[in-house]
Amino acid sequence: NTAYTAYVGAGGAYSRPDYGILSATNGKASTFTGPEASLMAFGGGRGGTYATTNDAGSGSSGGGGTAWASGGDAIYGSQGFPGSAGNNDAGGGGGGQSAAATAYAGSGSNYGGHGGAGKASSITGSSVTYGGGGGGGGGSTEAGGTGGAGGGGNGGIGNNNPAPTAG
């Protein structure tokens, strides 16, 4: 009768208005075994945003980062993969932190993964278009964690998300 709490880091929404596509892909569960809550981990969703309607690239995005936890190790969601340069790709979402033991609270280890950075998609004259960065993974509220930073659309680091609220 063990109660589990899962935290999911979602990636950026996939959007291509010129094709009428407005959708989002949420995080996916990773494999876990055993009764320990620390082994339950959810990965970040796959980000993806077309910044322009004329895209010569593949349009694929960076994959979502996974979340992981094991034994006494520090618990992090892993970083979303960046998009491919030249393909107008968004970074993948950061992995959500797994349900974690409260013993890690305040240790600085309880953070969701950062979103992957978007990469330059097109350069026309002095204008450069970038894919969006992936969303940061969720932190565990029960362990006092915070969300990961969003990936910068220009390859920089995004602002930290506010700390998650209980529930």
Short names for language-model regions:
Residues 1-167:
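Low-complexity, glycine/proline-biased repetitive segments and flexible coils/loops
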